[in-house]
Amino acid sequence: MKSLYTPTDYYMIRVPLVHQDLKNENSQDIDQLLHDLCNDSLFREQILVSSRTLYETIHTFLQAPDKLKGKKKRNFQQAILKYATRRATRTTPFGLFSSVGIGSFSDKNHLSFNQHSFYKKARVDLEWLYQLIRKLENEYTDRLSFTLNSACYIKGDRAYLLYSTDGKSEEVSVRATSVFYLINELCGESAAYQDIIRCLIDNYPNTPINKINQYVADLIDKEFLISNLRPPMTVSDQFQYLIDQAESRHIPNELIQACKDIQYQIDAYNRITIGEGEHQYLNLIETMNKLIKASSPLQVDAGLADSSIQLDNETSLAISELASMFTYMASPSANTLDHLEKYHNVFLERYGYEREVPLLEMLCSSTGIGAPATYTNPANEFFEETSFGEQFSPEMKQFFMRKYFESVRKKAPIQLDDETFHRICNSEIADEEIPLSFELNFFVKLRNGRVKLYLGPNVGSTRAGKTFGRFSHMSDSISEIIKTLHNKEKELTECNTKVCELSIVPNQTRSGNVTRNVSYREKEMSLFTNSALHLNDSVKAEDILIGINKDHNFYARHKTTGEILSFESNHMFNPLLMTNAVRFLLEISRDGKRKWNDFPWFSIYSDFKYIPEIKYKEITLSCEQWLIYKNDLSMHSNASLEEIKSPFFEFHRTYELPQTFYIVNADNRLLIDIENDCTLDVFFWELKKTNHNQPLQLVAVEHDADALMDRNQNDYSGEIVVPLLRKQPEKPLYLPVLNAIEGSGSDRIKMPFEDWLFIKLYCKQTREEELIAFEIADFYNQISDQYPVRHFFMRYRDPKPHIRLRFNGKAEVLYSLFPQLLNWLKSLREKGLVSESVITQYEREIERYGGLSLMEAAEQLFCEDSKVVEMMIRMHRMKDITISKEIAGMVSVIQFLEQFELTFEEQLTFLERNSLQNEYRTEFKKDREMYIEICNSDRDWDNLKKTSDGGMLYETLKTRKMAAAHYAFLIKKAFDNKDEVYSRIGSIIHLHCNRLFGTDRELENKILTLCRHSLYAQRYQKMNGSLAWK
């Protein structure tokens, strides 16, 4: 297995502030333990920073314990015990409980650190900061400058924002009047408030000044306009940025001084040793609340200044091998069907390969195709199936099931290695499928002096540096690592692509504490705040076009510069919580890449009561796991702890649980020791809180000892986050700049009776052929004798199956035939053929068929081919020909390629590119001679014409020859590149198969593949003289 990745020299180390020896101190005497903890200055400050409510309850417990009785006492006890356990065992950064630092790879291990190097870094909470900003924007509007929010876009006669930051408004919009367009143009760059007002007065002199002021104030209040006070999310100190901007705009000095006092107190608090800052923290919060009242005005993190921790290069090599294995094991993107793959098909059905569509138009349910299935911010205005098939091959599933039963029988871990994977994984992987970078998390343990790695519960992140981003303010060394990663990212990224940082203030502003980071990327899209980059390098939501490349992957392009953009976010905020547009941009940056973190055992073993330990070589991927339900213990709602103990210990013996295990929820881990009544009590209460059909997940504690140690030889839990980068740069991807055509222009959108009349005919799929071959064909023959019109049809699902029928003629002609059309539609309904008919606008797929100048010829070919297909289906239904529909379809496809004046070799090249070359070989071999004979075009299809029905088929197909030749002449004249020519021919062939076979893409692939096999076999015979060259 080829190595695909290189770990970076440096990684993040995450260490709790308390060593393991403290976690069980006085654990059996619950009252004493509570008193010890509540009098521990370090624990008190940790709780104060994390939960002010619990901190105040500690005071109640110490000063007036009688006030805590019954349920209140029990809840307090549970909360304290859980925090006490997490502070020594959980490495995930949270307030002052766990620290972040930097470690490195070296020749040998160095696992000790200075326990006195822990430090804290407080900064203002982003929610508090934005409340202050909104207050200043409201009170000192006339002193500020404003720009248009990059989250703003115009649709129809209204301007919208992608989302709101008040956490409740589903949609924010204003009328897109001439006044708004004027402000839009003026505030593309920062404009002083007074200049905005002056411009409006000059353009609307008869409008009262108070009305102008109110209009602009409304835009500011709704956040269409954002002030210069709003700090970029990628600067190191947002509060200092605000102070500097306020000073430059002459905000009253007393307010600025209040901010400076807070900044001074924050700096002073940061210098105080952790565990000694309780009093200063309370004073600081009080000062901040005097200015702006908030539930949690301060964000505090802990750091580890000692960077001497080292892991040996052998560990680095093992991690790179694991990263490669994960990628090889992942299903090729072409073999998976998820929400994005399904969206590819929806996009192509609507727009085709040659069209680039504005992002926001595409995602709109009314003007576009809506958001992908599973997107909810906002949800589509139509129902969509969101279930997807198996993501893993049957071979992969069988392999892991076999491994499972072997492991259970032998009572041994599921052991994976390269040799076993060679049996189920393809050793070849396409370059474009290899992710550019990612991160892996490991708990670091020690066995007999050797480092042992355990994959962390949250596994890692999808881009190197994401885990570091939120902590970039903690130290220069963390910022430098991010800078190095972003520079390396630039070197490895496909040369025609620019990486753009998605910098957002989330709809729940407090979540902005997670999205604050530092970025060294070339481009930035900042939503609801200002960008740290120059205007030329800032991207707006309205700037983005979406297309699909020839590898069937989405891409984004800047509509003005033409640059290909890859969007990333240097933080760990959950994309599922983001607005649809932002989530989509992040997801398509990994479109076509292997989903390395979609592990087979997650889904294959998901409902198993017990899962053995899983290992790859010496790395533990998953410790033993169990699921326990209330029903396992016959547990009712009023069960006492004593009643539960006996059935639990029986469960414990039956399933051979260890003495210590974790209750796990995502990366939340709560240590339980069954010989410790305090933690056992916690376990029972956690189980009691679950629903009857909701299990607790239990995970065995790691076998090995904690590896990290302080100068006093105390052991600490430790976790590392290792960035990995692909070894080779991405191959260049050439995407031609397409000639954009106005999305809603009259050349694209044809309203009813504007030369076209488009009707959707909803009917059962079982009666589609009857509708096509008889009703539509007969109706057209009837009206074409009276009116100069033409028509074409195609089949579609939205998701209901229907026929899309279009008539073309002058407006007066279409109006004249409309009464007959209505009578015909009425008769179809009476016959039970059509359940619903809808007249709507016709959106021409201009790019897909070569541009505006070729569209008339393409539509003429659609009309001729529609008549051909109507005749083909009719002949089959009337049994005028005995040739099967599949064979007739093959003949039709090959004859179409001839009518496009492609040589035999060009036909074969086209089919090689548009078929599944390794599929349907058995079926072809079964009737090889028949396929070769009937699909042979030698001597003007002499073999086909020998039979009467073959002759009928030949004459039918010949009727579209002139239209096909004319279109072929035009596309060859318009495009020098054969790929472009083949693309247009492919679209015509696809639409022909759609008319003949319906929306069954699998059958279409089969027909094209059998055509390929037939021509390939003919080529062999022709080369050997068995067939005459045409």
From Swiss-Prot:
Similarity comment: family membership: To S.epidermidis EpiB and L.lactis NisB.
Principal place of residence: membrane
Function according to Swiss-Prot or TrEMBL: Involved in the post-translational modification of the lantibiotic subtilin.
Keyword NADP: no
Entry annotated with the keyword Repeat: no
Residue pairs linked by disulfide bridges in the UniProt entry: none
UniProt cross-references to Pfam families, sorted A to Z: Lant_dehydr_C, Lant_dehydr_N
Localization (cell): Cell membrane
Organism: Bacillus subtilis
Record's keyword terms, sorted: Cell membrane, Membrane, Transport
GO cellular component: plasma membrane
Name of this protein: Subtilin biosynthesis protein SpaB
